[in-house]
A protein has these predicted regions:
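Non-ligating segments of multi-cofactor redox enzymes
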Residues: 1-191
Length: 191
C-alpha cells in the first residue's frame, strides 16, 4: 500500500457541500479508535468548504475552496509532538486521541489551521483521511467519505503510484496549498 494522494479539482465544485456534510455524518457521534474520538456536532469542520463571491449581479463568479489536513510529509506536528502524532502506512497524519489529551497548543502549531480542539473530550482533532474506512474490508469504495459523496467528481483519490493520480499530476495543473511552507503535502488542487 502506497501513500495516499488526494487531488481536488475545485473548478468542478458546485458548492453542494456534500463533502463537508458527509465528513460530519461520518465522525459526529462515532468513535473510530485508535484513530479518532467523536467529532463535536458544532464548531468543528475537519473538512471545510469556503465560498468566495466575486462580481455583481448579473455577472457573478463563485469560488469554493476546500481545506482540511494536508497530511504533510514534513508535518510540524509530528516533529513537535512525536509522542502523540504519527503517520500511518497510508501516509496519513494521525493525532492519537489518547496520548494527545490536553494538548491544545496543537491547534496553533498547524500552519493550515486544520486542527480543532474538542473541549468536551479535551483533545485536538482533525481529518484522519477516513483511515478507518480505508482499512475496513467491507468498505468497497476504499476512499474517504468526502470523496465518495461528491456528485461532480471533484476528487481523485489513490496511491501515489496510481496511474490516474500520476496522469493528473503530470499535467502540471495541480499544485499544493501554500507550497512556500515546504511541507510536501498529500493534497493537491486544480483551479
Amino acid at each position: 500500500m502506497g501513500k495516499k494522494i488526494l487531488l481536488i479539482d475545485i473548478t468542478r465544485c458546485n458548492g453542494c457541500y456534500s463533502c463537508q456534510v458527509s465528513c460530519k455524518d461520518e465522525h459526529v457521534g462515532n468513535e473510530w479508535m485508535p484513530w479518532a474520538k467523536p467529532q463535536p456536532n458544532t464548531g468543528h469542520f475537519w473538512y471545510r468548504v469556503t465560498e468566495t463571491v466575486q462580481g455583481q449581479i448579473p455577472v457573478v463568479r463563485v469560488h469554493y475552496m476546500h481545506t482540511m489536513c494536508q497530511h504533510c510529509d514534513n508535518c510540524p506536528l509530528i516533529e513537535k509532538y512525536p509522542d502523540c502524532v504519527y503517520r500511518t502506512e497510508e501516509g496519513l497524519v494521525i493525532i492519537d486521541p489518547v496520548k494527545s489529551y490536553g494538548k491544545m497548543s496543537m491547534v496553533y502549531d498547524c500552519p493550515y489551521g486544520a486542527v480543532f480542539y474538542n473541549t468536551t473530550s479535551m483533545i485536538p482533532q482533525k481529518c484522519t483521511g477516513c483511515v478507518h474506512l480505508l482499512r475496513d474490508e467491507t468498505w468497497i469504495d476504499k476512499e474517504p467519505r468526502c470523496v465518495q459523496s461528491c456528485p461532480t467528481d471533484v476528487f481523485t483519490f489513490g496511491d501515489e503510484d496510481d496511474p490516474k493520480v500520476v496522469a493528473k499530476l503530470a499535467t502540471g495543473e495541480y499544485e499544493t496549498y501554500h507550497p512556500e511552507y515546504g511541507l510536501k503535502t498529500h493534497v493537491f488542487y486544480k483551479g
